Amino acid sequence: MKKVLLTLAALGSLSATQAQQAGSWLIQGGMTRIAPSVSSGTLSAPSPSGTTVDVGADNQVTAQVTYVVDQNWALAVPLGLGFKHKLYGTGSIAGVGQIGTVSALPLSVFAQYRFGESNAKFRPYAMLGLSYAYFHDAQGSATLNSLNPLNPVGGSTGLKVDSKFALSPGLGMAYQLDDRWFVDFSYAKSLLKTTTTLSTGQSINTTLNPAIITLGIGMRY
């Protein structure tokens, strides 16, 4: 009986170690919050002088697939259906409220360096990602229509937000619950700038630099 117990214990230890070897896949699901930290330029003329903008945060259900390259290195690809952000007037038009919306689909790949032994229960990591922020379905609100001096009577002001590449450095931590299940938390900052152009010709440059905060639970394969 004692030999059987020792054998089972050894197998359990072996499976925990093998599960984190090169070639393992980590599949997780959870929530991601994208919160822009906006530094806005001013809207070009003709427009109210000093017109600037802010961009609201959004939370969505997301997933992530990670491939373990070796004991320390891994490649992670976040997955999701995208985010929808509200646009607000600031500066000389502060207080007017929402002036539009834009949908964003971030396409990213992250290289992670995981500290500690491969079979450790707690592993912090540093990461660097390349992200492509695909902006689509940007729409101006009735408030923007009324503020735009070039908007035709009864018409609407369209928006186009340029899609851009950005580097995304970050930190994270993973905690192994058992041989297969784990909890993962990460924080990244995407160094993102873009330009928004109105259908009537005015444009505005913005530094978005969104924080990307993800909490997930997953399984190791």
Where are these regions (language model features)?
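Cleavable N-terminal export/targeting peptides
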Residues: 1-23
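Short loop/turn motifs that connect adjacent beta-strands in outer-membrane beta-barrel proteins
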Residues: 19-24, 72, 116-123, 177-180
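Short glycine/proline- and aromatic-enriched beta-strand/turn motifs that initiate or cap beta-hairpins
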Residues: 19-66, 218-220
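Short, conserved structural micro-motifs that define repeat-unit consensus positions
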Residues: 66, 170-176
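Gram-negative (and chloroplast) outer-membrane scaffold detector with strong preference
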Residues: 35-37, 64-144, 210-221
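Flexible, solvent-exposed loop segments that connect beta-strands
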Residues: 39-53, 83-102, 134-163, 192-206
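Residues that define the transmembrane beta-barrel architecture of outer-membrane proteins
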Residues: 23, 57-61, 101-107, 122, ...
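Predominantly the C-terminal beta-signal and adjacent terminal strand-loop region
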Residues: 84-88, 178-221
